[in-house]
Amino acid sequence: MDDYNKAVLGGIVKIASKMGISTIQSYQSSQIFEAVGISKDVIDKYFTGTVSRVGGIGLEDIQADVEALHNAAFDPLGLDINMQLEDGGAHKFRSGKEEHLFNPQTIHLFQKACFTGDYDTFKQFTHTVDNMGQNGVHLRSLLDFSYAPDGGIPLDEVEPVSSIVKRFKAAAMSYGALSSEAHETIAIALNRLGGRSNTGEGGEPEERYHSESNSKIKQVASARFGVTSKYLVSAEEIQIKLAQGAKPGEGGNLPGAKVYPWIAKTRHSTTGVGLISPPPHHDIYSIEDLAELIYDLKNANRHANINVKLVSEAGVGTIAAGVAKGGAQVILVSGYDGGTGAAPRNSIKDAGLPWELGIAETHQTLILNGLRTRVRIESDSKLLSGRDVAISCMLGAEEFGFGTSLLMTMGCVMMRVCNLDTCPMGICTQNPELRKHFHGKPEYIINYLTFVAQELREYMAKLGIRTIDELVGRTDLLHVKSAPADSRMSKMDLDCILHNPAIVNSNVHFQKEDTYDFHLEDTLDMKVLMKKFKLSSKTPQSVKLDVSNTDRAFGAIFGSEITRKYGSDLPDDVYTVHCTGAGGQSFGAFIPKGLTLELTGDCNDYMGKGLSGGKLVVRPPEGITFKPEENIIIGNVALYGATSGKAFVSGVAGERFCVRNSGAVAVVEGVGDHGCEYMTGGTVVVLGQTGKNFAAGMTGGIAYVLDENWDFYQRVNKETVSLEPVEHKYDVATLKELIREHVELTGSPRGKEILDDFSEFLPKFKKVLPYDYDHMLRVIASMEERGLDGEQAQIEAFYAVQKNK
């Protein structure tokens, strides 16, 4: 019973965490579940109020299933012969057990087709997966096409393969989850086709930005790994990952054993030290916050489309409407079947919903709100065949993502060890020895996606449809398959999926002329900075101007142009902007090295978001009567995801200061709750009080905190960090120099007071140091003492630490 209680409690805590629920009172009656495949009678009586949109089985079917499972588990005579339960094949394929789209037979057919370029073998594969299971394996298995009675149109009148494949994308799979060989192979293949690959949330090595292996879609997830100005300007599309189909509501956790030196470099973290992704984006707590991030990223790269990734769930249409109003140009609705092999099993099996429900709801809701022509809808999650793509398009999608299937083309054999770094095919591993086994080629992926487009064209010809745009939303060309009256299929009701609210025109899709206008030409960046600064000159220049809190993402556009021209090669302070007034949201977001923003006044939330080498200085106006160190001068979530650069703030910051900082240096005179949360690098100096939960999830970097009242230990989260006195000469010199620079730039009275009596204040400082980070730095230092250079020392230190675990 103790084990059972522990398991049940763990399950409740896990689900509450996914849903952002903190207390059991909020969990009770929250109705956060949706039923799929259960009849209305059962729902109304036993799960009153729970959403169940497609009907399904009744009590008699549930009873039959329970009895079958019981009989399989227990001897009919009650003898304790073998009490071990059989593996039902839910996770790994087992012959005669649960159906899997990829099983030994289908894997063989699929890989033979891709490796040899044999379209006939591919047709055998799609025939098998499209007709799998007595009752089907997807909601789309219950649908069929209503072909044109006149036989359709000639195939050569249908949109060509070369055009269709430009709508194909590689689903987001991170460099870190995939080996560099696999990640680059996917990017090269999609680039050659004219489609787009996706970096995933792990960043991308800079050397790939302007090569054939550049991923055209750059993802921005909650951890902001590798999100720099250079990363963003190299994109044709920027995707905001709000959730992941296979594990919605969960943040990632990359164990230290998988943070190889090259992964740490790309993610701006420390070799061998675990990385924690926050479950939410800490700059998104409302649809308005999401609109702000969309705006910020559009400023960071004016030429990129902004894509928002959602997960199929009840109400996703309402969220999508808000996303469309917020300016997104693409909305991805991801289904539960998308597959990170590293997700927990309960997430893989029991979280998220079929994309058929999400795509249909999103398409319908956008039509009803007059927003459908503003955005493209994208679907992904186990799209395998031309039939899958056709149905997805007919339910409302215009672009299509492929994930698991691309791994299969490169040799994946479904060992289900993606999370263990032991992939025998060199696909989902960073182990150099296992990566030698990688035999994937871009040509295999090109063969597969060409086959899908070719098969899609065949369906379109039979339907009498000439272009993809003509096919979007055409649910009138779908019907539910007939089924025996007593079968489970017959109990399903797919009317909600097939409903088309477009009364006048059944074919409503994206129209370029209706795209959201951000009015970037009206920003101060475009009207002032781009005109007054000579971008062609590296001679130090400065501009003075007034700002107000309506000037959002100030500096981001000009910063992006600096990055395009110079990368990160400029010295500090080449372009300096002296601002007066109230800085708007995301002041100085993503600004690169060479750009300095000095603000005399105060600043709103998200200051220095994604700081990429630039410098920020905030100070109160002269002649103030209050003490800066006792008053808030910048808002919440400053320096979120900063990767490099400096920030000096003469005053107090709001909550979540430097959350996910991975390389910036900051000096501030007080912070709110959750300071330095999930930090993985950089240095933070706090010359005053902190709020509670300081350093929660912090796995890298160093913080120096002034603890005048000797009570800081009560407000720090000591799960991953230690508190130490500042005694080492390097620490003392670093701290003193940063305070000196802070005083020089801001004129801080508090900083000057500390410097004038530094020996008195020094014992009151605490050094916040993550355990794993400290250990790894010591091992690296010992390797360098043996004569190894920096990179080789990191590699040897990584293997030494893993060997001793």
Q: Can you describe what each PLM-predicted range is?
A:
Residues 13, 24-25, 38-46, 227, ...:
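Alpha/beta enzyme core
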Residues 3, 7, 19-22, 120, ...:
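Conserved active-site and cofactor/substrate-binding residues in soluble primary-metabolism enzymes
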Residues 1-6, 14-17, 96-100, 112-115, ...:
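Hydrophobic alpha-helical scaffolding
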Residues 8, 29, 34, 234, ...:
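Mobile "lid/hinge" segments at catalytic clefts and subdomain interfaces of large enzymes
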Residues 1-229, 235-237, 241-248, 257, ...:
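Flexible, glycine-rich loop/tail regions that form catalytic "lids" or insertion modules at the edges
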Residues 15-26, 198-202, 301-309, 372, ...:
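Flexible, glycine/charged-enriched surface loops at secondary-structure junctions
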Residues 434-435, 446, 459-463, 472-475, ...:
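Long, distal/terminal scaffolding or interaction modules
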Residues 7, 11-18, 27-30, 46, ...:
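Generic, well-ordered alpha-helical scaffold segments in large soluble proteins
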